[in-house]
Amino acid sequence: MPLSASNPFEQDVEKATNEHNNSEDWGLIMDICDKVGSTPNGAKDCLKAIMRRVNHKVPHVALQALTLLGACVSNCGRIFHLEVCSRDFATEARGIINKAHGKVSEKLKTLMVEWSEEFQKDPQCSLISATIKSLKEEGVTFPAAGSQATTNAAKNGSSLSKNKEDEDIRKAIELSLQEQKQQQMETKSLYPSAEIQQTNQNLRKVRALYDFEAVEDNELTFKSGEIIFVLDDSDTDWWKGENHRGVGLFPSNFVTSDLNVEPEAATVDNSCVPEDATEEIKKAEPEAVYIDEDKMDKTLQVLQSIDPTDLNLDTDLLDSEVICQQMGPMIDEKLEEIDRKHSELSELNVKVLEALELYNKLMNETPMYSAYSKLHHPAQYPPTSSGVSVQSYPVQPPSGNYMIQGVHQVTVSQGYGLGPDQMGQLRSLPQNINSSDCNLYTKSNRQRMCHMKAITTWQRFSKHTSER
């Protein structure tokens, strides 16, 4: 890893790992750890400066650099963990284990085993375990987890944390003295006043349950899991405390006195959570899912442009992907509805075409109204020629059954008695009716009925179309 000339950690790292040092300077090491969190791109720059000293030809310098590296991993948080679990560090660590001095190699392997145990629940920090497994396949031996070497490393980490706490207490006392002088000149703020109580006793420590971002100048910013020294807890809602970022006020329900509680497992009464936090929780609730073509297009575009080798997952992309997957059943229902409507319109189209075809067929046929008119004007019938057969319609017996020859006979189940006036009307019918005239009359009525049926079908189709 080449070291940039503008690396702000170069001077401090060289001083902490000087070959003339007889012991570790834990005060300077803690200052470097604090500087990582307060410097932009601090984790990457600090790791570069440390690895430059780990590759030093003097083993004493390399061992001190590894001690500093372990301190940074233990105290600088997740941002430094991700840098240690990068491919660049894994590649360089592989080279150091294979080529460096024996003690340097053993200490680095011990640290890697300790880190793999610490990071085993974090999928983004799995590269350390993968590197150890790969080196074991190549024949490199590593100390077992829980062995004497790793136990010593854990003890060093515990002593390091204790030294850090002592150093933080010392700094807190110094800052408290300065804060007391400045407090008298400051104007009264919107928050409850908090005066510094100076005692020679050890300060009370609490652990942060949630992240808190300072809004006012006199507030204290901290992250979940960090240790805060309480300077004043006289007010029930707002306490005054100190951490490596400075001194300020913070909400008392954001911390706990149990230092062993993990931030993820800690629970807080909802009634104690501020209204702003409640609003943020409500905003985090999933929104109602509906078919959104723009969201699907954007998600596809991001998926096509993303780097598959990037281990940092985009939470927005994951949320968009989940929402798009939830749209699947809704899209299926919409397609079924469209297919059903398409089938209905297809059937209706077939019926309309059949009706139009029947209508055109009937309009092309010319009905014979001349024969039909003869039936309604019997007095104008011309005399029957000798070539046309004449059929007579004799008067039936009193039973009242009359049949016309040439027309389909219909059996009447009950006879009807006719009076003299009805008999006279029947005798006045023309005596000669041709069977072809009756057939034309029946055909004309059938054409009218078909015509009316076609018009009715067309009206129903027009009404159905206007309703849609």
Swiss-Prot record:
Compositionally biased spans, kind Polar residues: 147-161
Gene Ontology BP annotations? protein transport; signal transduction
Q: Which residues form the UIM domain?
A: 164-183
Q: Which residues does the UniProt record annotate as the domain SH3?
A: 201-260
Listed SMART domains? SH3, UIM, VHS
The segments labelled Disordered in the record are 1-20, 146-165
Which post-translational modifications are recorded for this protein? Answer: Phosphorylated in response to EGF and PDGF. Phosphorylated by SRC.
Q: Which residues form the ITAM domain?
A: 358-375
Pfam families, from UniProt? SH3_1 (PF00018), UIM (PF02809), VHS (PF00790)
Q: What range(s) does the VHS domain occupy?
A: 16-143
Quote the tissue specificity entry: Ubiquitously expressed.
- The main place the protein resides is cytoplasm
The UniProt keyword set, sorted, is: Cytoplasm, Endosome, Membrane, Phosphoprotein, Protein transport, SH3 domain, Transport
What's one GO MF term for it?
phosphatidylinositol binding
Q: Which domain of life is it from?
A: Eukaryota
- Location(s), subcellular: Cytoplasm; Early endosome membrane
Protein topology in the membrane = Peripheral membrane protein
Which terms in the GO cellular component ontology are assigned? early endosome membrane; endocytic vesicle
Q: How does it assemble?
A: Component of the ESCRT-0 complex composed of STAM2 and HGS.
Function text: Involved in intracellular signal transduction mediated by EGF. As a protein associated with focal adhesions and actin filaments, it may play a role in EGF receptor-stimulated cytoskeletal reorganization. The ESCRT-0 complex binds ubiquitin and acts as a sorting machinery that recognizes ubiquitinated receptors and transfers them to further sequential lysosomal sorting/trafficking processes.
Q: State the family named in the UniProt similarity comment for this chain.
A: Belongs to the STAM family.
Q: What name appears for this protein in its UniProt entry?
A: Signal transducing adapter molecule 2
Query: By which gene is this protein encoded?
Result: STAM2
